[in-house]
């Protein structure tokens, strides 16, 4: 009798858990790039990578210009693979802003000296707060910001040939 109660209770618990997980899987992915697009860039205060002085986002991002915000770290292997694409974008009609994410400043400087610095401005994000405000969940992540200061494209993971071409087409 006691075993029968445990079996019935276990079966009911299994069904309950199955229903909860099934319902959870039916919800849209909150991390989907499409859902996080079309929002204005948030206002924030950061530190300049080189001078360590406070910088306001409103002083960096001006209406009328395209910006590519790239969140990177020296310890990030995929960041190395996307770096040649960023170097190529440096000479286009877009301002590249790098956000150095939870990194050792000396290691980050070695990274840039070794691979080149594609950024017109680099901000330090030692605690990861700015990246989270932008909607990033890791590195590398890249955001294309239009002339109205609205995020129009989010790239999760390294920039590749396909995403590079898409960026170039969007800023034409």
Where are these regions (language model features)?
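Hydrophobic beta-strand anchors of alpha/beta hydrolase catalytic cores
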Residues: 68-69, 96, 142
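Short alpha-helix adjacent to the SAM-binding motif of class I
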Residues: 81, 88, 106-114
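Short pre-active-site segment immediately N-terminal to redox-active cysteine/selenocysteine motifs
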Residues: 65-67, 71-75, 138
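Thiol-based oxidoreductase modules, predominantly thioredoxin-like and allied folds used
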Residues: 94-107, 119-128
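Thiol/disulfide oxidoreductase modules built on the thioredoxin-like
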Residues: 113-118, 125-171
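Conserved redox-active cysteine motifs that mediate thiol-disulfide chemistry
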Residues: 71-88
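A short beta-strand-turn-helix
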Residues: 45-67
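N-terminal targeting signals for export/organelle localization
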Residues: 1-47
């Amino acid at each position: 009798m006691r075993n029968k109660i445990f079996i019935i209770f276990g079966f009911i618990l299994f069904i309950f858990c199955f229903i909860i997980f099934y319902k959870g899987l039916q919800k849209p992915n909150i991390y989907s790039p499409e859902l996080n697009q079309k929002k204005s860039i948030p206002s924030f205060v950061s530190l300049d990578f080189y001078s360590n002085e406070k910088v306001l986002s409103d002083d960096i991002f001006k209406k009328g210009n395209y910006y590519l915000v790239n969140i990177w770290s020296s310890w990030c292997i995929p960041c190395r693979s996307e770096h040649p694409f960023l170097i190529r974008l440096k000479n286009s009609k877009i301002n590249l802003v790098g956000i150095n994410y939870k990194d050792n400043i000396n290691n980050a400087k070695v990274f840039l000296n070794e691979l080149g610095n594609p950024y017109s401005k680099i901000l330090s994000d030692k605690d990861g707060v700015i990246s989270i405000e932008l909607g990033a969940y890791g590195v590398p992540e890249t955001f294309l910001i239009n002339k109205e200061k609205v995020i129009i494209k989010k790239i999760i993971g390294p920039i590749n040939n396909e995403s590079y071409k898409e960026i170039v087409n969007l800023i034409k």
